[in-house]
Amino acid sequence: MSEDKPHQNLAVIGHVDHGKSTMVGRLLFETGSVPEHVIEQYREEAEEKGKGGFEFAYVMDNLAEERERGVTIDIAHQEFDTDEYYFTIVDCPGHRDFVKNMITGASQADNAVLVVAADDGVQPQTQEHVFLARTLGIDELIIAVNKMDLVDYDENKYKAVVDEVNQLLEQVRFNTEDAKFIPTSAFEGDNVSEASENTSWYDGPSLLEALNDLPEPQPPTDAPLRLPIQDVYTISGIGTVPVGRVETGILNTGDNVSFQPSDVSGEVKTVEMHHEEVPKAEPGDNVGFNVRGVGKDDIRRGDVCGPADDPPSVAETFQAQVVVMQHPSVITAGYTPVFHAHTAQVACTIESIDKKIDPSSGEVAEENPDFIQSGDAAVVTVRPQKPLSIESSNEIPELGSFAIRDMGQTVAAGKVLSVNER
């Protein structure tokens, strides 16, 4: 790991089949992050299976089942360097039922690349991903208008997609000045690492140049430690090893830490990153660590690790601002869907709908409405059905956003305004 460069977590978002995996594979390939012989092996495998051209995406699809289906599933962490930054890609899958990955993934991202196919334009998932990125606090968006090779590198096709995406960004109040558009072909490699002769009409940066120009994220090291647990492993000779990404603060060996809502604590013995032992971990670092006196059955995915003397909040109830994206009917008090917050998934009841908000102005449109529906924004009071650690978004924004899922889809997303602790 390059210690001397700042780190960025990059989400790659967009509609299914618009070329996200191929783009990620191409970025890794162009930055020398994938050895040539591995690419060759993938190429042979892809051709044998009649999927020639998928070799870059194969870099991302490590799971045999995914390869067979031609679909990318779990979030894959991949790393590459530019001159300025050390990037971890959070490859966010695009299939309908993978949106919750997108939520746990995007909340971990500093910035995002939105991939939109030039021959297909803005699609429902494009809208949903942009909306989620906005709600979850991604500020800088690089839009790769991809598959330019399929529209013969036609500038008018490119401009039409740019207009369409800009309209979408304005709808969700994303500052369009913070959006950079680049015509690309991940498959052919146009404008990924260097300017392409096929788009002589375009004089902007390549994708890697645009990534290199991103502002440096300011790590929330001053905030108290918050580290949501993704998995818990038992490793022989070490013991129980929780794994997760530091969202805020610093994890040091020797720290006394507490896991909430499981409510167990202990001393950090070792911290490992990329299979190397490190003295401490900072925001953005994906780490495994071992805590004295904490067993595998004491903690689970969805717990949050924090200092024993400033433990993560556990909500009895919380007030939140939500935006309903798609719900087949209406949402009323008593509705109990599943909330996805950081790595936790907990059924929560909307106890009351306190205010309806006008999404365009942010003003209160109605007090105590009877119901809300798709397109509405509202302030609601929520009661988790089992213990949930969540923070107010103005105190620890990294742990203050969530998605609401029901019926196999994301129905709403939101952020926590205040927590009434248990």
From Swiss-Prot:
* Annotated stretches, region: G4: 146-149
Residues covered by region (G3): 91-94
Q: Which residues bind Mg(2+)?
A: 21
Question: Is Cytoplasm included in the keywords of this UniProt record?
Answer: yes
Name one molecular function that GO assigns to this entry: GTPase activity
Annotated stretches, region: G5: 185-187
According to the entry, every stretch annotated as the tr-type G domain falls at 5-221
Q: Which domain of life is it from?
A: Archaea
Q: Which residues cross the membrane?
A: none
Sites where the protein binds GTP: 14-21, 91-95, 146-149
Task: State the EC number(s).
Answer: 3.6.5.3
Q: Which reaction does it catalyse?
A: GTP + H2O = GDP + phosphate + H(+)
Q: Where in the cell is it found?
A: Cytoplasm
Q: Where is this region: G1?
A: 14-21
What the entry lists under PROSITE patterns is as follows: G_TR_1, G_TR_2
Tell whether Cytoplasm is among the UniProt keywords: yes
In which broad location class does this protein mainly occur, judging by the first location in its UniProt entry? cytoplasm
Query: Which keywords annotate this record?
Result: Cytoplasm, Elongation factor, GTP-binding, Hydrolase, Magnesium, Metal-binding, Nucleotide-binding, Protein biosynthesis
What are the GO cellular component annotations?
Answer: cytoplasm
Q: Where do the record's region annotations for G2 lie?
A: 70-74
The record's annotation in HAMAP family points to: EF_Tu_A (MF_00118_A)
Task: Say which family it is in.
Answer: Belongs to the TRAFAC class translation factor GTPase superfamily. Classic translation factor GTPase family. EF-Tu/EF-1A subfamily.
Describe the function of this protein.
GTP hydrolase that promotes the GTP-dependent binding of aminoacyl-tRNA to the A-site of ribosomes during protein biosynthesis.
- Tell me what this protein is called: Elongation factor 1-alpha
Provide the species name.
Natronomonas pharaonis (strain ATCC 35678 / DSM 2160 / CIP 103997 / JCM 8858 / NBRC 14720 / NCIMB 2260 / Gabara) (Halobacterium pharaonis)
